[in-house]
C-alpha cells in the first residue's frame, strides 16, 4: 500500500466573480521510503499540492490518503521544510529544535534527547547553545531539517528548501539533506524549479503542466553506474543529460509567458 495516494484531485479557488482552477485530475502514488521530486512551471501549483498532502488544504474534488486514510486536517505523519528556515532568533538552536514537539505536546525530555542525538549524528552538537544569527545559511537549513525530524514524521515535504542559498551551498546542503533523509528512512517529496536538483536527489521525478495543472510525465531515475549514487555522483552519471533534456522538453511546452 502506498504511503501517499493522491486520487483524481482537483482544486479551485473561488471569488465572488470567478472560479480559478489550480489543479485538475492529479493522480500520484508514492511508496514508503521513496524520494520524489516535483518540477513544473512557475505558479503551476507545486506548493499547493504539498499543502494538500499535508492536510492544510482540502481538495475541491478527489481524495488524498496518507497511509490508507483520507486526510482530515494536518497529519502528525507529515513534516514540512520550507524555503525559509523560520528559526526564532531569540531561542538557541536546541530550543528551536523543540518547537514542533512543544506544539504537539510531546514529552519535553524525550524530545530534547532526540534533538541532541540528531545534532550529534549530523555534526552540529557543538552548536546546541548558539543562536541562529551565529549560523551560516546552510547550517540554519540543517537545523530546520533536524527540527522537522525531532517529531519523527514518516513523510517530509520539502518546498524549495535550498532556493535562498548560493549555488555552492545549495549543492552541499542537497547532498547532506539527501543523506539524512535516506539515513532516517523517510519518504520525501521535494518541490523545486531546478531540474538538476530534481534528478540528482530523486528516485522519481514528476512533471506538472501549467494551470490548470496535472502530472504530464513521470521518470524513474536509474543509472547504469548502479544504485546508491550520491546526488553529486548522479550529476556525473552517463544518463543524467538524457533525463535533463527529456524533462526540459516536457516543461518547455508548458512555460508560463508573462
Give each language-model segment a name.
Residues 39-41:
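The feature captures the beta-strand-to-loop junction immediately N-terminal to the Walker
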Residues 54:
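Helix-to-loop junction immediately C-terminal to a conserved catalytic motif
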Residues 156-159:
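Catalytic Walker B motif of ABC-type/P-loop ATPase nucleotide-binding domains
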Residues 62-74, 114:
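Conserved ABC transporter NBD signature motif
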Residues 91-98:
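Short coil-to-helix segment of the ABC ATPase nucleotide-binding domain corresponding to the Q-loop/switch region
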Residues 145:
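Hydrophobic anchor residue at the start of the ABC signature
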Residues 130-133, 151:
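Conserved signature/switch motifs of ABC ATPase nucleotide-binding domains
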Residues 98, 109-127, 179:
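Conserved ABC ATPase "signature" region
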